[in-house]
Amino acid sequence: MARRVLAWEGARCARVELTMLDGAAMRRLNARAFGRRRLTDVIAFALPQPDGSLLGDVYICPAVARRLVTNGGRVREELIRLTVHGTLHVLGYDHPDGPGRTRSVMWRRQERYVRRLLGGKR
């Protein structure tokens, strides 16, 4: 999934590693990286390389994904969404916190890619 997003974005010299973490590990990572002692769904780090390539790490917490699923949604779809979300962060996209988040350029792009990955559904 991340590879497809990278290709759609034209990121030819980029690689993203995906890691699934349990709740305790995600909470520790969030505390270490950002000083926030709470659980979160996805954390992404971009590591630009001297040769111009880009490496990224995306950490996803499936337990949070399960809690985020609403209105008959599926966990698989939410995991795809979080993978796309983290990959876009690695590529430099960002969004505001709060209600404006779902109206941001990043969010619209994310949802377009999620639909593509789900085969045009929704």
What are these regions (language model features)?
Residues 82, 86-90:
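Catalytic glutamate of the conserved HExxH
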